C-alpha cells in the first residue's frame, strides 16, 4: 500500500465535479467515499497464488468470524432477478454445455452467490474477506452511484437450498472510477469487502496478468445462472479472441453469472501461472452487435492495472 493516495468523500453518490478530478484508469473508489490512486502503486508481481483453504468448520464455528447465519428463504431468493449489463445478453451459444457442479470442494466453494436489492450476481474470493465480481453488480456504469451496500449478502458455495458456509454481509463496495463515471465496459469490474473471513475456510482463487496473448488458453466459468434454482453451473471452452482488456470465448452463460471467474486449473510448469487455480478475467457480457461481440461471450481481462487494483482492495481492512 506504500505510495497510495487517499481522498475521503464520505458520500454514496459521488458528485460529477468530484469524479471529474479522480476519474482515470488507475483510480478506484469505494461506496463510502475512499478513493485510491493505484497509478502510484506498483506491486512488482504478476501472479497471486491460489489457496484451497481449510475446508473445515461447521457453520456454527464460522459465526465467530462474523458470518451472518440468518438466511433469506430460498423461495424469496428465487424471485431475485439476475443482474445483467446494459448491453450484451449473456448467452447460450448453440448447444447448452453447462453442467452442474457441487460446492463441497475447491475451487467451487470459493465461488458464491451475491444478492442485493432484488438482484443477484456471482462472485469469487481472492482473500479472506475480498470478493471479485462485475462492475455492473456493484454500480450502474456512468451513474456515479453505487447500489445500496446494506442489502448485499454473499453466500460462499451456495448449493441449491443449502448455504454450507453461512451468509456474509458486506462492509464496502469497490469499482473503477472510470466505470462509475463513464460506464466504459473495459472497466466493468467490482469487488466486495465482507464482514467475515470465510475465504480462510473455503479457499481463495489465484489470479495473474500477462502482456502476452492468451489465445487458446482454457477458460472455465462457474457461477449461478438465473435459469437454475441457485445451483452452481460450469462451462468450459478457450480464449478465442484476445484483446488488451477483453477476453472472448464460447462458454455458455446466462444472466446471474455476471461476475463469475474466468479461470483454469494450471498444471506445474504452465506459462504465466502454474500449479494452482488461477483467474485471468471476470465474466461480464454476452452477445451484442458487431464482431467479435455478436458471436462470443466475454470477460473483463485482468491486466496489470486491474491486477494491482485487486491487490490493493484485498489489502484493505
Regions found by a protein language model. Give the residues of each.
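Chymotrypsin/trypsin-fold serine protease catalytic domain
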Residues: 160, 170, 174, 185-257, ...
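Catalytic histidine site
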Residues: 106-153, 238-243, 266, 280, ...
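Conserved catalytic-core segment of clan PA serine endopeptidases
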Residues: 86-109, 113, 118-120, 139, ...
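Cleavable N-terminal signal peptides
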Residues: 12-13, 23
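Catalytic nucleophile loop of clan PA
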Residues: 124, 252-283
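C-terminal cap/linker of serine protease catalytic domains
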Residues: 280-317
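Sec/Tat signal peptide C-region and signal peptidase I cleavage site
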Residues: 19-25
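Protease-domain processing segments flanking chymotrypsin-fold serine proteases, especially trypsin-like
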Residues: 25-126, 308, 312-316
Amino acid at each position: 500500500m506504500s505510495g497510495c493516495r487517499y481522498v475521503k468523500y464520505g458520500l454514496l453518490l459521488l458528485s460529477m465535479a468530484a469524479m471529474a478530478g479522480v476519474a482515470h484508469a488507475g483510480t478506484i473508489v469505494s461506496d463510502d467515499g475512499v478513493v485510491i490512486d493505484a497509478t502510484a502503486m506498483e506491486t512488482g508481481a504478476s501472479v497471486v497464488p491460489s489457496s484451497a483453504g481449510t475446508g473445515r468448520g461447521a457453520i456454527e464455528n464460522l459465526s465467530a468470524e462474523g458470518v451472518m447465519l440468518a438466511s433469506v428463504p430460498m423461495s424469496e431468493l428465487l424471485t431475485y432477478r439476475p443482474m445483467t449489463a446494459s448491453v450484451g445478453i449473456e448467452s447460450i451459444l448453440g448447444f447448452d454445455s453447462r453442467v452442474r457442479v457441487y460446492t463441497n470442494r475447491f475451487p467451487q466453494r470459493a465461488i458464491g452467490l451475491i444478492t442485493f436489492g432484488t438482484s443477484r450476481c456471482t462472485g469469487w474470493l481472492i482473500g479472506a474477506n475480498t470478493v471479485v465480481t462485475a462492475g455492473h453488480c456493484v454500480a450502474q456504469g456512468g451513474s456515479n452511484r453505487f447500489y445500496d451496500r446494506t442489502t448485499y449478502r454473499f453466500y460462499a458455495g451456495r448449493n441449491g437450498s443449502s448455504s454450507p458456509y453461512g451468509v456474509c454481509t458486506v462492509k464496502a463496495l469497490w469499482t473503477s472510477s472510470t466505470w462509475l463515471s463513464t460506464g466504459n465496459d473495459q472497466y466493468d469490474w467490482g469487488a466486495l469487502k465482507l464482514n467475515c473471513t470465510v475465504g480462510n475456510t473455503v479457499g481463495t482463487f489465484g489470479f495473474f496478468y500477462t502482456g502476452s496473448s492468451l489465445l487458446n488458453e482454457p477458460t472455465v466459468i462457474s457461477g449461478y445462472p438465473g435459469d437454475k434454482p441457485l445451483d452452481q453451473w460450469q462451462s468450459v471452452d478457450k480464449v478465442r479472441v484476445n484483446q488488451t482488456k477483453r477476453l472472448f470465448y464460447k462458454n455458455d452463460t446466462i444472466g446471474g453469472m455476471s461476475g463469475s471467474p474466468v479461470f483454469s486449473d494450471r498444471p506445474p510448469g504452465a506459462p504465466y501461472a502454474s500449479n494452482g487455480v488461477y483467474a485471468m478475467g471476470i465474466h461480464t457480457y454476452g452477445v451484442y452487435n458487431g464482431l467479435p461481440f455478436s458471436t462470443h461471450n466475454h470477460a473483463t481481462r485482468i491486466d496489470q492495472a486491474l491486477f494491482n487494483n485487486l491487490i490493493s482492495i484485498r489489502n484493505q481492512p
